[in-house]
Amino acid sequence: MHLRPWNIDTDYDTLVKWWDQHDFGRVPKEVLPREGMVVEDENNNRICAGGLYMNINEHKFGFMEWVVADPKAKPKLAHKSIKLLIDSLIKLATDKGCVLLYTVTENPGLHKRYVKYHGLSQGENNARTFVKDLTNGKYGPMLWAKSQEVLDEEQDN
């Protein structure tokens, strides 16, 4: 198992495949961060990936996002790979000069993992996220930014 920087041009199709398999929705390529990591097995098969938004020239705040794993990966391999990925994203943020790292997820597995294995503190329990398409609809319904609960509520209204 090894780690490498992600390349949005060559890794994007894999991310889309995993997001589709997780029924997550597709994050537009142009909004993904330039910084990110991919964990691969010994045969260079991708296992998991995640991104890190940061602009150290303007602030020392990092935002870790889009952590996703191949849903077909064996659970033990996925667990070890995700640990390596998150530890590496935290190290990257530290090495680049970030002093605070923030992340948001609705995934209960990541909730536990962030606290137990990576030393993150839980911030909020019932926060809501909001997103606005500033292109007047180019990104459609933005399913990638909505939880199933929100999608169900929208369908009921």
Write out the residue ranges for each language-model feature.
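Short N-terminal secondary-structure initiator segments
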Residues: M1-W19, N136-A145
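Hydrophobic beta-strand residues in large extracellular and virion-surface proteins
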Residues: L3, M37-V39, L101, F130
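Short secondary-structure junctions
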Residues: L3-R4, G25-V27, G119-N125
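A conserved beta-strand-loop-helix scaffold within acyl/acetyltransferase catalytic domains
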Residues: P5-N7, D13-E42, I47-A69
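Short loop segments at secondary-structure junctions
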Residues: E42-N44, K72, D133-G137
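Acyl-donor binding region in acyl/amide transferases
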Residues: G62-H118, E124-N125
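Active-site/acyl-donor-binding loops of N-acyltransferases
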Residues: T103-L151
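Short acidic DE-rich linear segments
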Residues: Q155-N157
